């Protein structure tokens, strides 16, 4: 989806829409591509100042090489000074320890309508987890970590938020900022 920085807030149906909009404005990005809905609909060509990846569309890619290839495929759409900003799925060490126990890690979200979404996270090794939502069949995902091969190979910078604060390994957020090709 192509948007100007003004349109970014309307695109996001998230609590942090203002934060993503502020990022686009701070970077003075005129051409913005939002890939938060997935990597399947990537355009064949284009040159974007900013590509935003909220909701980690890379989380389902479990292999190092495949993840690096997916990042390279997205990077080809960046302008020379453009940035790819990934809100990476991150599991801090204290939550990984709980997910590694037989009972796993339970996360619950309550919605305005009173419904509750319950996720059971089970660590399976190498930063991979099986997630069961409300008793559904498991989905396998891979969380990011600071030593991630795909990030290192792409020259990414790791931050703790869209405001570029330092990454805190005990915190709950990992933002990867991948530069365009130079």
Regions found by a protein language model. Give the residues of each.
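SAM-dependent methyltransferase
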Residues: 87-149
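A short glycine-rich, Lys/Arg-flanked "PGG" loop and its adjoining helix->strand segment in the class I
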Residues: 66-83
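C-terminal lobe and adjacent flexible extensions of AdoMet/dcAdoMet transferase-like proteins
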Residues: 144-182
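A short acidic, Gly/Pro-enriched loop at the edge of an enzyme's catalytic core
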Residues: 42-51
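Conserved class I S-adenosyl-L-methionine
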Residues: 1-38
């Amino acid at each position: 989806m192509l948007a100007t920085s003004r349109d970014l807030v309307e695109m996001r149906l998230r609590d942090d829409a203002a934060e993503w909009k502020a990022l686009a404005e701070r970077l003075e990005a005129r051409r913005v591509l939002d890939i938060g809905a997935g990597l399947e609909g990537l355009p064949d060509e284009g040159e974007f100042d900013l590509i935003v990846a909220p909701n980690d569309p890379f989380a389902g890619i479990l292999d190092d090489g495949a993840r690096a290839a997916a990042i390279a495929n997205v990077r080809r759409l960046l302008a020379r000074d453009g940035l790819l900003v990934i809100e990476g799925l991150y599991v801090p060490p204290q939550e990984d320890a709980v997910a590694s126990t037989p009972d796993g890690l339970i996360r619950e979200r309550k919605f305005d309508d009173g419904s509750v979404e319950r996720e059971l996270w089970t660590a399976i090794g190498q930063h991979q987890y099986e997630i069961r939502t409300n008793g559904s069949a498991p989905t396998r995902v891979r969380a990011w970590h600071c030593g991630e091969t795909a990030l290192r190979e792409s020259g990414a910078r790791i931050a703790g938020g869209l405001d570029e604060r330092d990454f805190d390994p005990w915190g709950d957020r990992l933002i990867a900022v991948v530069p365009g090709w130079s």
